[in-house]
Curated annotation (Swiss-Prot):
Top-level class of the enzyme under EC nomenclature: translocase
Membrane topology: Peripheral membrane protein
Role description: NDH-1 shuttles electrons from NADH, via FMN and iron-sulfur (Fe-S) centers, to quinones in the respiratory chain. The immediate electron acceptor for the enzyme in this species is believed to be ubiquinone. Couples the redox reaction to proton translocation (for every two electrons transferred, four hydrogen ions are translocated across the cytoplasmic membrane), and thus conserves the redox energy in a proton gradient.
Protein name, UniProt field: NADH-quinone oxidoreductase subunit D
Catalysis performed (reactions): a quinone + NADH + 5 H(+)(in) = a quinol + NAD(+) + 4 H(+)(out)
One Gene Ontology cellular component annotation held by this UniProt entry: plasma membrane
Superkingdom of origin: Bacteria
Organism of provenance: Akkermansia muciniphila (strain ATCC BAA-835 / DSM 22959 / JCM 33894 / BCRC 81048 / CCUG 64013 / CIP 107961 / Muc)
């Protein structure tokens, strides 16, 4: 903590004491306060350098990069399929969302389209990830502003989704589920029945969470009118996802540029009115309800058929064929050792992830490695507004504002 070298003496006279108590003029001294990079309110290794006049924030300087691992450069030195496990480590709270967005970008470069069942499986995984990310964000946000009980309810639902991850992918956290042209395994039929039961239970938990928090005057007062982002500012700063929709802009890539068959499912896009912390919270609550709605439709309309591209050069054959068919064995060997032979070209694919618009730009000169891999991080773009947004707020508002953005530093720093 750094303070000014000037000495501030409090006068003994009643007149001066009254002036110091009631004046709104700056006192002429500021204090520099470091929040993070190791602080529970920053939700990761984010550092904020705040300049304070009393309790009022005069300036905010976000410092990112503490979790930078050179992911984009790594992606340019390994095969397309080999990069899938690295995408788990971007938004590690919704790893399947990153897997699928990256795989879709490469498939767009290749000109591939998954069979209907493969697309439906990915939509199921995406919406489970969205719910998992949002329910954790809502629970942790309650703790940020002093509501501990809600976190326990929310974490219980997230734990159920991790059980589904384990059934679907074999892993609870960093799943590496997708492959270029498909995914590692089909969904167990028993799991689909369990997910339908979960949807009913999770809907009740959302109602309870809403009742606990949105009928709590202290919680509401901590959020309403705090961290307001206008429509114009949200667009000019490149904010996306629930944070953008909370400012009243109805932009959802699942509706705007449908992918993986999202146009076949009915769901609403919730928006806010004021763009404050309260709206960002309520939009996420409603988005979870819409995710449950999509999940039910996916299961009820799940088509039969293959989950991967069939007999396509560059995709892995079925394991049982590898054991009995020479051509399949050769194809697996060539795909594993040489990778996908992508054509020359450039593509950009963007997905509506829990944190916002996650985009991948690929520049290919041909062959098994990309010439350039660039990732658009929604958390990085959303946090860019902090220097402007924090000004004029109190120190006590910092956890409320940061928590309302629901960011993750693994994806921000890459």
């Amino acid at each position: 903590m750094k303070t000014s070298t000037k000495t501030f003496a409090i006068a003994d006279t009643a007149a001066n004491a009254d002036y110091l108590t009631n004046t709104s003029e700056p006192l002429g001294e500021t204090m520099t306060l470091n929040v993070g990079p190791s602080h529970p309110a920053t939700h990761g290794v984010l550092r904020l350098v705040l300049e304070l006049d009393g309790e009022e924030i005069i300036s905010c300087d976000p410092v990112v990069g503490h979790l930078h691992r050179g992911m984009e450069k790594i992606g340019e030195t390994i095969q397309y399929n080999q990069f899938v496990p690295y995408t788990d480590r971007f938004d590690y709270l919704a790893p399947l969302s990153n897997n699928i967005a990256y795989a879709c970008a490469v498939e767009k470069l290749l000109g591939w389209e998954l069979p209907p069942r493969g697309q439906a499986l990915r939509v199921l995984a995406l919406e489970l990830s969205r719910f998992s990310s949002h329910i954790l964000g809502v629970g942790v946000y309650g703790m940020d502003v002093g509501a501990m009980t809600v976190f326990l309810y929310c974490y219980e639902e997230r734990e159920k989704i991790h059980n589904f991850y384990e059934q679907l992918t074999g892993a609870r956290f960093t799943s590496s589920y997708t492959r270029i042209g498909g995914q590692t395994r089909d969904v167990p039929n028993e799991m689909l029945k369990e997910v339908l039961v979960f949807c009913d239970e999770a809907a009740k938990t959302l109602d309870e969470t809403e009742a606990l928090l949105l009928k709590n005057k202290i919680f509401i007062d901590r959020l309403q009118g705090v961290g307001v982002i206008s429509r114009e500012k949200a667009l000019s700063w490149g904010i996306t996802g629930a944070n953008l929709r909370a400012s009243g802009i109805k932009r959802d890539l699942r509706k705007l540029t449908p992918y993986l068959g999202y146009e076949n499912y009915e769901f609403d896009v919730p928006v806010g009115e004021h763009g404050d912390c309260y709206d960002r919270f309520t939009v996420r609550i409603e988005e979870m309800r819409q995710s449950l709605r999509i999940i039910r439709q996916v299961i009820e309309t799940m088509p039969d058929g293959p989950i991967n591209m069939v007999d396509t050069k560059g995709t892995l054959p079925e394991k049982k064929k590898v054991l009995t068919d020479m051509e399949s064995l050769i194809r697996q060997f060539m795909t594993t050792t040489m990778g996908v032979n992508a054509p020359a070209g450039q593509v950009y694919f963007a997905a509506e992830n829990p944190k916002g618009e996650l985009g991948f730009f690929l520049d290919s000169k041909g062959g098994g490695l990309p010439n350039r891999l660039r990732m658009r991080s929604p958390s990085f773009c959303n946090l860019s507004i902090l220097p402007e947004l924090m000004k004029g707020h109190l120190v006590s508002d910092v956890p409320a504002i940061l928590g309302s953005f629901d960011f993750v530093m693994g994806e921000c720093d890459r």
